[in-house]
């Protein structure tokens, strides 16, 4: 990423001269590491460490693959330790099989992506706002099959971040005011976004929404192309998902679910999709 872009986006000064990590720099290390012996973030070998600031560590993961032809980008917070280990094992297997780097990196990135209840929930949520019609496909379910070329999956903090040795959940510290996390967003996510400027961006959860708006204010993204307000598809979010999809009545919601906020989010999403030429479903 050029220094002019970094300066324009507001890269924290102490990180301005750093060169982002690339797979080629880590391929030999990945091939030689015994990942079975790594059982926690604290045991990740030191050469994978990208940055450390107080309680925060960021480590390299082979998620360099970017689907520049994607029309929709699904954005999480940060890969967790389990995803780091699975991706490393997939990359190691690809290296030993002699796969081309592009093929290897794609396999590493999508190993186990959106498994379990998350996938059908995500499909239902995306279809409910009309994304499948904007993409001119029957259902967003095909984004995990025949239409996979239309979707890119990433995280606003692409490299795994751990706080006090645990997966970072976006709550503390605040990624929008923490220099190391700001730098991680600009080093990696911003570079990906610049390669896919015309896609629609789907933030998974409110913390990611705030981060994407922070990036939009810096010129990394177009705010009009961010679909804020879609509930996180996790099974733990079942009640919010059910109400968003019209499967649960408002008067039956628990005190933990703000039905009025979900109503407002749905209206805003409908207006945003209408501006993109997609009328709300009848």
Question: Would you name each region that the model predicts?
Answer:
Residues 5, 9-200, 208-214, 238-239, ...:
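A polyanion-binding, active-site-adjacent surface
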Residues 206-228:
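Active-site-adjacent alpha-helix immediately C-terminal to a catalytic or transition-state-stabilizing loop
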Residues 228, 237-238:
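Long, compositionally biased interface segments
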Residues 232:
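Active-site glycine-centered loops adjacent to acidic/histidine catalytic or metal-binding residues
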């Amino acid at each position: 990423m050029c220094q002019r872009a970094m300066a324009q986006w507001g890269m924290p000064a102490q990180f301005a001269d750093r060169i982002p990590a690339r797979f080629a720099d880590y391929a030999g290390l990945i091939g030689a590491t015994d990942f079975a012996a790594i059982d926690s973030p604290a045991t990740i070998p030191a050469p994978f460490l990208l940055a450390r600031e107080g309680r925060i560590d960021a480590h390299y993961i082979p998620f360099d693959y970017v689907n520049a032809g994607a029309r929709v980008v699904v954005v999480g917070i940060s890969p967790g330790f389990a995803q780091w280990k699975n991706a490393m094992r997939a990359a190691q297997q690809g290296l030993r099989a002699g796969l081309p780097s592009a093929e290897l990196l794609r396999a590493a990135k999508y190993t186990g992506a959106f498994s379990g209840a998350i996938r059908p929930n995500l499909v239902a949520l995306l279809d409910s706002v009309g994304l499948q019609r904007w993409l001119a496909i029957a259902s967003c379910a095909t984004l995990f099959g025949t239409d996979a070329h239309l979707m890119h999956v990433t995280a606003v903090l692409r490299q795994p971040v751990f706080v006090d040795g645990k997966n970072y959940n976006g709550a503390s510290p605040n990624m929008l005011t923490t220099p190391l996390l700001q730098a991680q967003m600009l080093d990696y996510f911003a570079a990906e976004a610049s390669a896919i400027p015309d896609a629609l961006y789907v933030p998974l959860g409110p913390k990611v929404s705030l981060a994407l708006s922070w990036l939009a204010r810096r010129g990394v993204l177009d705010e009009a192309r961010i679909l804020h307000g879609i509930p996180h598809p996790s099974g733990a979010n079942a009640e919010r998902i059910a109400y968003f999809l019209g499967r649960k009545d408002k008067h039956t919601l628990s005190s933990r679910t703000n039905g009025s906020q979900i109503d407002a989010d749905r209206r805003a999403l409908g207006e945003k999709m209408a501006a993109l030429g997609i009328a709300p479903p009848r």
